């Protein structure tokens, strides 16, 4: 049983949220907030029946997150996943695979490294134990495909990277190297080919389906190459000068 005495200057909202999280992890209502200003009423509030220990005494070791997991596994040994209230710093990330385009904006902004990618394949990976439920990934997602689920996963799966979403990569039409996401490249081709000034011709539209190296090579040899300068003048040789001499 835990009693927390609040001082007049204590921020109630923060303490109440933390107490609610602790109740959820412990699986009981043994945490009580005492918000009493009258000394006589305080004496009455503190004189309560002493509760029996919920578990044998143990020595918690590790970080705060590790201690929280230890408390959950000790107080709720049968539980695998404990649902937590909103604003809890533990939880999972849910991805709408139909909306996700694997742009990986969430990966670049994840402060704890809970979200990751695969350098070889279009994949979005997630490690639940590292997630802080900060909400940056959900806010930055341009497709609104990410939602947060506050929970405490007590299984070993929380320490492993799981694939939340993956798709087939696109093969370059010139060299065959894999790049990007197949569905995204096909969607961009459908929207731009023949409908945008830069991709009006079929040859220009093919550049969308090329890797970065092949795209530069194709653009360099195109007739309307924007990088091309003026035609170089012909090199003058001694024959040009001899041809202008009258005695030649």
Regions from the PLM with identified roles:
Residues 125-127:
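Accessory beta->alpha helical hairpin/"wing" motif in late/C-terminal subdomains of nucleic-acid enzymes
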Residues 142-143, 239:
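Short, charged/polar low-complexity linear motifs in solvent-exposed/disordered segments
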Residues 6-17, 23-120, 130, 140, ...:
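Ferredoxin-type iron-sulfur electron-transfer modules and their immediate structural context
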Residues 1-3, 92, 123, 226:
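Beta-sheet entry/capping signal
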Residues 1, 201-248:
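Charged, low-complexity interaction segments
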